[in-house]
Amino acid sequence: GMVYILGDVGMRGKKEELIAFVAQLKGRKVLIKGNHDDVSDYRYQQLFHEICDYKEMHDTIGKEHYSLVLSHYPIFSWRNMGRGRILLYGHTHESEEDRFYQKCLSEMRANDCRHVYEAEELRAYNVGCMRDYMNYTPRTLEEILNSRRKV
């Protein structure tokens, strides 16, 4: 299947080690570039099915269809955010910056005087690999959505 990597694969380490590491990962890989990703090496580029800055896509869990935005960075406004489209992002780790971002989204939900978010919950998930529920392991969309329900 497809494996979506939301950036900063090459944050540390030598280029040869990075190429060897990514080459051993299973699945067809899509890299959503982060601020620490150097994709100038042709050998590295060839390891990915696609390399992009931002991706809009759909996924299905059973009979449920999900509309998604994949970005390395957390963003405050994404297409159809008030119509159920879910943002998956990384970059912020488990930082004060991420807590501030999530607080801002909560304020947007609570103070929605235009009722933009009324029909669907505004959802953005930090899927950084260092998060407890990610544990440096690829996760399915279902696992990501269920992890938030447990919190």
Each PLM stretch: what is its role?
Residues 10-16, 35-42, 76-81, 88-100, ...:
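Active-site environment of divalent metal-dependent phosphoester hydrolases
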Residues 64-82:
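Short, motif-level signal for alpha-helix interfacial/capping segments enriched in acidic residues
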Residues 1-17, 121-132, 146-151:
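N-terminal active-site segment of His-dependent metallophosphoesterases
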Residues 52-56, 96-129:
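Flexible, gly/pro- and Lys/Arg-enriched active-site loops
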Residues 3-8, 29-35, 70-71, 87-93, ...:
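Active-site neighborhood of phospho(di)ester-bond hydrolases with catalytic His/Asp-centered motifs
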Residues 27-44, 118, 123-148:
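A short, conserved beta-to-alpha structural element at the edge of catalytic cores
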Residues 1-56:
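Core catalytic region of metal-dependent phosphoesterases/phosphodiesterases
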Residues 58-68, 120-123:
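Beta-strand-turn-beta hairpins that frame and shape the catalytic cleft
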